[in-house]
Amino acid sequence: MFLVNSFLKGGGGGGGGGGGLGGGLGNVLGGLISGAGGGGGGGGGGGGGGGGGGTAMRILGGVISAISEAAAQYNPEPPPPRTHYSNIEANESEEVRQFRRLFAQLAGDDMEVSATELMNILNKVVTRHPDLKTDGFGIDTCRSMVAVMDSDTTGKLGFEEFKYLWNNIKKWQAIYKQFDVDRSGTIGSSELPGAFEAAGFHLNEHLYSMIIRRYSDEGGNMDFDNFISCLVRLDAMFRAFKSLDKDGTGQIQVNIQEWLQLTMYS
């Protein structure tokens, strides 16, 4: 979709096959992950509707302004290349070759990972880390992860897409553990800014408040699956913004079709 095609071009920076994987693959992938270090109401007349619209636009303008400021400081890893699984580089490291073999076991005959398969493998991995508080990765979370990484709109992740996502999850897991200073298994609201900055996201207070309301519990604590889900979406949205802001002004223009593609398939 538009979102992924945009951020993959940007510079800088379902079948449930998982159930039959067995403990071996889950154990190996568990080792890989630990290797990283650890509007206004319209009723009552036209005047009310107009006031609500103005309020909504001011809120939206503030959010977009905050995102543009943050995006200017974000330097993501290079996006995954669009290469087929069979295009094996001669100079691949043994670690990458091992990961490719594991991917073949996980992906099955179609050599792509569905949202259900992604959910199964992530939940196998987090069970090996009791220090990470989580309710588990749900299917909606995994569908969102697949959607923002799905460059060819197949609804599944190819090898490079999956490897890019997996490497980010490893990096963010290490950051999560580092900033869980009270060892509660969650990231508190006071710990969150440092964790996000370590991941490369410099946000203002307004955006932090929005993120806490969306991804944290009533006490302001964010568990591991919500932390990963939030960062996956931030990474994708920042890439999309940077690729659309071709002249570097911090402003973009999109039509309704582009806006719907940005917001609905993510």
Curated annotation (Swiss-Prot):
GO BP of this protein: proteolysis
Main localization (coarse): cytoplasm
Binding site for Ca(2+) 3: 180, 182, 184, 186, 191
Example GO molecular function: calcium ion binding
Keyword set, alphabetical order: Acetylation, Calcium, Cell membrane, Cytoplasm, Membrane, Metal-binding, Phosphoprotein, Repeat
GO terms for cellular component: calpain complex; cytoplasm; plasma membrane
Domain notes: The contact of the 5th EF-hand domain from each monomer allows the formation of the homodimer and also appears to mediate the contact between the large catalytic subunit and small regulatory subunit for the formation of the heterodimer. EF-hand domains are paired. EF-hand 1 is paired with EF-hand 2 and EF-hand 3 is paired with EF-hand 4. The fifth EF-hand domain, left unpaired, does not bind the calcium but is responsible of the dimerization by EF-embrace. The first four EF-hand domains bind calcium, however it is not sure if the binding of EF-hand 4 to calcium is physiologically relevant.
Binding site for Ca(2+) 2: 150, 152, 154, 156, 161
Full protein name: Calpain small subunit 1
Role according to the record: Regulatory subunit of the calcium-regulated non-lysosomal thiol-protease which catalyzes limited proteolysis of substrates involved in cytoskeletal remodeling and signal transduction. Essential for embryonic development.
Annotated Ca(2+) 4 binding sites: 135, 223
Residues engaged in binding Ca(2+) 1: 107, 110, 112, 117
Start and end residues of each EF-hand domain: 94-128, 137-170, 167-202, 203-231, 232-266
Transmembrane segments: none
Subunit structure: Homodimer or heterodimer of a large (catalytic) and a small (regulatory) subunit. In presence of calcium, the heterodimer dissociates.
SUPFAM superfamilies from the UniProt entry: EF-hand
PTM-bearing positions, type N6-acetyllysine: 177
Localization per Swiss-Prot or TrEMBL: Cytoplasm; Cell membrane
Residue(s) carrying N-acetylmethionine: 1
Disulfide topology: none
Organism (species): Sus scrofa
Highest taxon listed in the record's lineage: Eukaryota
Signal sequence coordinates: none
Modified residues (Phosphoserine): 6
Entry-linked PROSITE patterns: EF_HAND_1 (PS00018), EF_HAND_2 (PS50222)
